[in-house]
A protein has these predicted regions:
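Conserved catalytic-core motifs of GNAT/GCN5-like acyltransferases
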Residues: 111, 129-145
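Conserved glycine-rich acetyl-CoA-binding loop
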Residues: 80-94, 101-103, 107, 113-121, ...
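Short secondary-structure transition/capping segments
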Residues: 76, 120-122, 143-145
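Conserved catalytic core of the tyrosine transesterase superfamily
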Residues: 1, 107, 113, 142-151
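Acetyl-CoA-dependent GNAT
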Residues: 2-4, 8, 12-82, 90-95, ...
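Short acidic/glycine-enriched loop/turn segments that link adjacent beta-strands
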Residues: 68-70, 116, 139-144
Length: 154
């Protein structure tokens, strides 16, 4: 696969990807670390996408839609350390936002560690704005979350 951010390289996350997604997340300490049981418990509620080739996942994105509120929560976005700065995170986010628009989602929100300046810059570049703060949201280490939101144009 040539490196690049082409959305043609993004596909839906399927349950067979679970072990690769969990391994990828472990290689990214800033990503939310889910237990396999947590992921399996929520697999019906979570939509996800992966980017990679037949053997290796470069990154993944997981969201939960709250249809009654026309909202989507971005739960986790991670790109492996060896695959960063190639546009893969942007490709994943763009596919997710495109699907949100197509199903009538009006806003997207997320939480990010206050110390994760790289992620905050990434989301800001993609149109997200700070919308609040949640003290002591994260554990290991304890840290506040910055909440960010993005309004989708219909």
């Amino acid at each position: 696969m040539k490196t690049g951010s082409s959305v043609e390289n993004v596909r839906r996350l399927v349950s067979a990807d679970l072990s690769k997604v969990l391994l990828l997340a472990k290689s990214c300490p800033e990503a939310a670390q889910w237990l396999p049981s947590e992921f399996e418990l929520h697999i019906e509620d979570v939509r996800g996408w992966v980017i990679g080739d037949r053997e290796i996942l470069f990154g993944f994105l997981a969201v939960r839609t709250i249809t009654s509120a026309h909202e989507m929560e971005l739960l986790n976005l991670a790109v492996g350390p060896n695959w960063r700065r190639r546009g893969y995170a942007s490709a994943l986010l763009n596919v997710a936002l495109s699907e949100c628009r197509s199903i009538g989602i009006q806003s997207v929100f997320l939480e990010v560690r206050e110390s994760n300046q790289r992620a905050i810059s990434f989301y800001t570049k993609h149109g997200f704005a700070p919308s609040g703060r949640r003290p002591n949201y994260y554990r290991n280490p304890d840290e506040a979350a910055l909440t960010m939101s993005f309004k989708l144009a219909n």
